[in-house]
Amino acid sequence: MMIHSKRRTFLKAGLIASVGLAVVNQLQSQAVAQPANPAELGTFDLKKLNNADAVLIAALAPVILAGTLPQAADARKVAISEVVDAFDRTIAGLSPLVEGEIRELFSLLHFSLTRKYLAGVAKPWDEASEAEIAAFLSRWREHRFALFQGAYQALAKLMIACWYGNPLSWGAIEYGGPPYGKELGL
């Protein structure tokens, strides 16, 4: 009798959680925040990301890439735009499974309730301060649950790869770029 009761409780909890997630997903899909001023980000030819994703990446980039982006305002804007474009190209090249996981992560970070309670950021991403974003990233990097640590690692590693794969970043690290055919004697 005890096992049957535990099983029933488990099934009820699973059903309630499933319905809750379905409701949150539906609400989120209807209320994805659009950037307050998309013109500030420039024009993107996005293949996999949407405007809200571009805003999120543009907000995270200066914090994750702190100290590596150009300081001049125009050059910094170009660099962040390049990171957003590279992130989009990278997502387009991932397997459908990994792309789906990134999409789920972005959905959680876009929805105001999960952004506030899971990320600790109450404001939309384009209004959040760098200090708020840094605190969120630090919490997830050091979180006791591996799921949050993994999400942080995915965001950070993709962002870093997108920046350092760009020739705009090479001058600051004195990297001359990869060897080409002539340099290799081909």
Regions found by a protein language model. Name each.
Residues M1-L21:
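N-terminal secretory signal peptides and thylakoid transit peptides that target proteins
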